[in-house]
């Protein structure tokens, strides 16, 4: 319905990714404004491009961030850039629902500090904003960099709420923490049962992402797994009731042929 939503956007190994990749892509697609830009957490590989976008004057109406996002230098810088750009910041916690036309974001994580973490301080990965996305019958989950403990916490909450009925047999799943073996647990994936799993990682990452264990869990859950390191930009659509994923590099190869 004319809304443009963006989740994260950064790189730890590509300089000026916002200026030379994200912004040109948005302009090429004719996107004149981002209505809501979601920030899962403040690692450079998730926000470096956003920082450049906000500094460029490109309009972003809302930033959606976790209410429990740690107050570090990156958060303070984002808040300052958003204020200078006239971008409104919305703080989300578990159970919050945000509507954009037919699309809705439901926050699955984090919850309140006392309930979620026993009042203890935690790192920014554990406090990543996790969202369930739904538009008509098209559904997906964005996970940030949460670990297996947070996945279990989300499942426990879903089992106690009506929201849980909709967060299963989803169309796409953005693999947690780039396919880390400390995330993407069997129980979490089997409960979500995603048709397609998307793994964002580079060939040269020093962490060995994605792990064989995580990919195995995705495949065991019945997911088709796609990787940005192999396919470049990934596009998921639903056609005739089935989710389909195409990669930019595959499309480019077919075009040349």
In which residue ranges do the predicted regions lie?
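Non-globular, low-confidence helical/coil segments that flank catalytic cores
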Residues: 1-257
């Amino acid at each position: 319905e004319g809304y443009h939503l963006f989740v994260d956007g950064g790189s730890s190994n590509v300089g000026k990714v916002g200026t030379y990749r994200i912004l040109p892509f948005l302009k090429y697609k004719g996107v004149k404004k981002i209505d809501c830009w979601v920030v899962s957490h403040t690692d450079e590989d998730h926000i470096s491009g956003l920082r450049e976008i906000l500094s460029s004057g490109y309009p972003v109406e809302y930033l959606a961030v976790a209410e429990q996002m740690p107050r570090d230098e990156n958060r303070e810088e984002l808040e300052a850039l958003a204020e200078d750009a006239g971008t409104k910041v919305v703080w989300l916690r578990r159970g919050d629902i945000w509507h954009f036309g037919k699309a809705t974001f439901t926050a699955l994580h984090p919850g309140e500090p006392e309930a979620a973490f026993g009042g203890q301080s935690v790192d920014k990965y554990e406090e990543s904003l996790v969202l369930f996305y739904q538009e008509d019958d098209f559904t997906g989950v964005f996970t940030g960099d949460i670990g297996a403990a947070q996945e279990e916490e989300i499942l426990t909450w879903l089992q106690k709420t009506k929201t849980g009925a909709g967060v299963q047999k989803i169309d796409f799943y953005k693999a947690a923490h780039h396919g880390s073996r400390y995330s993407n647990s069997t129980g979490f994936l089997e409960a979500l049962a995603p048709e397609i799993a998307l793994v964002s990682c580079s060939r040269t990452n020093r962490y060995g992402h994605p792990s064989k264990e995580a990919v195995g869990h995705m495949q065991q859950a019945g997911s088709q797994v796609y990787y940005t390191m192999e396919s470049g930009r990934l596009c998921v659509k639903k056609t005739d009731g089935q989710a389909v994923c195409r990669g930019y590099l595959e499309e480019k190869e077919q075009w040349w042929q």
